[in-house]
Amino acid sequence: MDSEHIVFRVRNEIVTLKPEVISDQYEYKYPAITDKKKPSITLGRAPDLSIAYRSILSGFNAAKLDPDDVCSYLAAAMPLFEGVCPEDWISYGIIIARKGDKINPSHLVDIMRTEVEGNWSQSGGADVTRNPTVAEHASLVGLLLCLYRLSKIVGQNTANYKTNVADRMEQIFETAPFVKIIEHHTLMTTHKMCANWSTIPNFRFLVGTYDMFFSRIDHLYSALRVGTVVTAYEDCTGLVSFTAFLKQINLSARDAILYFFHKNFEEEIRRMFRPNQETAVPHSYFIHFRSLGLSGKSPYSSNAVGHVFNLIHFVGCYMGQVRSLNATVIQTCAPHEMSVLGGYLGEEFFGKGTFERRFFRDERELQDHLEAEEAKIDIALADDATVDSGDEDFYGGESRSPEAVYNRIIMNKGRLKKLHIKRYRSVSSNHQARPNTFAEFLNKVYSDDN
């Protein structure tokens, strides 16, 4: 009999079958480009820029914008922002430009056009007979791109924050080298009619293209990034959090991973560091893989690496970081166990690189300081009030070594010490906890009642 079959009895009948489950139709897709073809989209017929400008500006003022027309205009306006490539620009084997080449955002992607005409209307702008200047085009492009950033601001109690951001954006695009083309508060009013535009693939694609261009090319209108910067490492929260974590504890990726004492980290680490993905290559297509449509289900999101994400932010909470306290817990990824490991790692690395003497009069003074610090560590290891003298062999020569931390956890039977719980209570009780955040989790799990 096939080893994949099972046999059982139902109402005096012997049943033999092969258990099968639904295959995952939404597997993680890695962004690496293997066919050496630039990311591409298809838009309608390219418009006359002057007509398109007047039509889009009229629609902007009336808070009635057609997304297809906006995308067509944004693509047509790309040649206005020509710049010089500072170095050879190559990503995934694709030669984007050579050093000294004149390029504009359209050189980064392939934009194909059909013969479908846009719904262009000159109403509200027909009385303007002159052609708009480059500065006017830049202002309109900038305001349109800002619609993307505003649509990415979601959550409770964000109305005032969003309004303030929109006002600041308007100020940028009415100050030289830009020119004022709309009245105050128009951007926020129009955004309310376009609140979900970040979900429109073509619009997201063009916003990401502009951001990739201006992040590399020094340009008069580089401030256009104020509306596009959110496309960089979009849907990449897990990997971005891990990078910030390394800076916080001042370790290399390899050394940090040695502290990840949980079996569920294995698959996530393999997923996050798959070879040939250009995760560490500056100005790569990887940085904008989500907006450019290179990955439908990101392997680098917080949900894709939930155990890593939870651990990083529990360590951040222990260190009192507001960003971590406000982050959303991935409830399906062992938050209780991650909070225990986070407490031990937080204790080991808390304050490292914060209050330390770093500068000295000469090399001799530096050497004396290092020797004094080593002596302090030896004394602490000899009697740190937490380890029995007979257990010192578990700790080796370094209190922060992975072996030392691991053995402390095992000797405490995988439970937090009182000082860990006290610290968690302290940082969470002084913070206004939002629903489903790490602050709320710590308040509930490690409260006095529990």
Curated annotation (Swiss-Prot):
Post-translational modification: Phosphorylated by host CK2. Unphosphorylated protein N seems to have a better affinity for leader viral promoter encapsidation. Phosphorylation of protein N in ribonucleocapsid may stabilize the interaction with protein P, thereby playing an important role in viral transcription/replication.
InterPro entries: Rhabdo_ncapsid (IPR000448), Rhabdovirus_ncapsid_C (IPR023331), Rhabdovirus_ncapsid_N (IPR023330), Rhabdovirus_nucleoprotein-like (IPR035961)
Any one cellular-component term (Gene Ontology): host cell cytoplasm
Disulfide topology: none
Residue positions, PTM Phosphoserine: 389
One example GO MF annotation: RNA binding
Compartments where found: Virion; Host cytoplasm
Keywords carried by this UniProt record: Capsid protein, Helical capsid protein, Host cytoplasm, Phosphoprotein, Ribonucleoprotein, RNA-binding, Superantigen, Viral nucleoprotein, Virion
Further facts: Displays a superantigen activity in human and mouse, activating mostly V-beta-8 subtypes of T-cell receptor.
Subunit-structure text: Homomultimerizes to form the nucleocapsid. Binds to viral genomic RNA. In nucleocapsid, binds protein P and thereby positions the polymerase on the template. Protein P acts as a chaperone on free protein N to prevent it from aggregation before encapsidating genomic RNA.
Family under the similarity heading: Belongs to the lyssavirus nucleocapsid protein family.
Function: Encapsidates the genome in a ratio of one protein N per nine ribonucleotides, protecting it from nucleases. If expressed without protein P it binds non-specifically RNA and therefore can bind it's own mRNA. Interaction with protein P abolishes any non-specific RNA binding, and prevents phosphorylation. The soluble N-P complex encapsidates specifically the genomic RNA, with protein N protecting the genome like a pearl necklace. The encapsidated genomic RNA is termed the nucleocapsid (NC) and serves as template for viral transcription and replication.
Name of the molecule in the record: Nucleoprotein
Organism of derivation: West Caucasian bat virus
Gene: N
